[in-house]
Amino acid sequence: MSSNQAEGLIIAAHGRHYTVELADGSLRQCFPRGKKNGPAVGDRVRITPQGRDEGAIEAVLPRRNLLFRSDEMRVKQFAANVDQLLIVVAVEPTFADDLTGRSLAGAWSADIEPVIVLNKIDLPNGLDAARARLEPLRRLGVPVIELSAQDHAMVHERLAPRLAGRTSLLLGQSGMGKSTLLNTLVPHAQAATREYSAALDMGRHTTTSTRLYHLPEPGGDLIDSPGFQAFGLQHLNGEQILRGFPEFAPHIEHCRFYNCTHRHEPGCGVLAALQAGQIDAGRYALYLRILDENAAARPY
């Protein structure tokens, strides 16, 4: 690294420009050189400072992982160097099982640990139904943390210890209470957003961008992303899709054919496990939907 360069952490992304936090806590609005794939929130980068508060991103430092989601048109980077994915669902309104399952598959395919946060447990009428819908995921070993985001003591008792010293990405459909949870965990979140906006003259764009916040004691980082209603996985190949369904793994070794797709082949260990009730039918149906979508998708 040359003497006029510095290393920093990307704490926000707004299209093709990024907010980079340097070691001294100062912020710079930076732009990547060239048109290759850009960095993501959570990336550590090397920049060349320019002017009072700008800079050019020269390189992205090696990352542990990178989480994507995609649609028919393009692949979108979520965040890099993530330790765990917090998927926020709620007792009310009804959450989408399909979206939850896709988020889990995206996390597992990127070697990121998923955690489900069941919010609004103070609404008892739908609690049993929500628990029942999450039970197949509990059986897979996915941690489910139940809380009410409006109960600060409960959040700090049940969730905060899991965040300490880790980088967590917060995802959730609109209406699940993700913003309330963020403001409970990071009391200065709204103030920080206004500060970044003023310092970098970002205006309204900051409200819809992915952003990293530093958690108060006992520490850790929390990445918040805008509410989403779709989580496409068209960027995954067949092997990566299977990593998103770890419960298939013990049965794949019993497949008769090495290139089995687990859809219709004779002697398929996964289909046998499905028929025996060892694989959840809803999860298997999601696997088929993802395969069909990816087969129909246009290449990027």
From Swiss-Prot:
It is found in: Cytoplasm. It comes from the Bacteria. Its cofactor is Zn(2+). Residues 69-231 form the CP-type G domain. InterPro entries: G_CP_dom, NA-bd_OB-fold, P-loop_NTPase, Ribosome_biogen_GTPase_RsgA, RsgA_GTPase_dom, RsgA_N. GO terms for biological process: ribosomal small subunit biogenesis. One of its GO terms (cellular component) is cytoplasm. Keywords: Cytoplasm, GTP-binding, Hydrolase, Metal-binding, Nucleotide-binding, Ribosome biogenesis, RNA-binding, rRNA-binding, Zinc. Binds 1 zinc ion per subunit. GTP binds at N119, K120, I121, D122, G172, Q173, S174, G175, M176, G177, K178, S179, T180. One of several proteins that assist in the late maturation steps of the functional core of the 30S ribosomal subunit. Helps release RbfA from mature subunits. May play a role in the assembly of ribosomal proteins into the subunit. Circularly permuted GTPase that catalyzes slow GTP hydrolysis, GTPase activity is stimulated by the 30S ribosomal subunit. Monomer. Associates with 30S ribosomal subunit, binds 16S rRNA. PANTHER family: SMALL RIBOSOMAL SUBUNIT BIOGENESIS GTPASE RSGA, SMALL RIBOSOMAL SUBUNIT BIOGENESIS GTPASE RSGA 1, MITOCHONDRIAL-RELATED. This is Small ribosomal subunit biogenesis GTPase RsgA. The lineage of its organism: Bacteria, Pseudomonadati, Pseudomonadota, Betaproteobacteria, Burkholderiales.
